[in-house]
């Protein structure tokens, strides 16, 4: 499932960054977003146009078209 399908206040692990261009991948890395990292959906706007996630105690805002590239799974750590 993608980050767009995440449920608020649940913790997920990013398992893959799929099919995005190199510039977006570098942007993700600058935010600390990479495979294996834990993230929590804090808030989403109406229709999930934008998402606010927590990664390593940092809050990051993403657009839905960016979040679609982040493949996640539910984390064993809650």
UniProtKB/Swiss-Prot annotation:
Molecular function terms, GO-annotated: transition metal ion binding
Domain of life of the organism in this record? Bacteria
Q: Which GO terms describe its biological process?
A: iron ion transport
Any Pfam family matching the protein: FeoA
InterPro entries, A to Z: Fe-transptr_FeoA-like, FeoA_core_dom, Transcriptional_repressor_C
Q: What keywords are assigned to this protein?
A: Ion transport, Iron, Iron transport, Transport
> How far does the signal peptide extend, from start to end residue?
none
Family affiliation = Belongs to the FeoA family.
Q: What does this protein do?
A: Might be involved in Fe(2+) ion uptake.
Q: What's the name of the protein? A: Putative Fe(2+) transport protein A
* Source organism: Helicobacter pylori (strain J99 / ATCC 700824) (Campylobacter pylori J99)
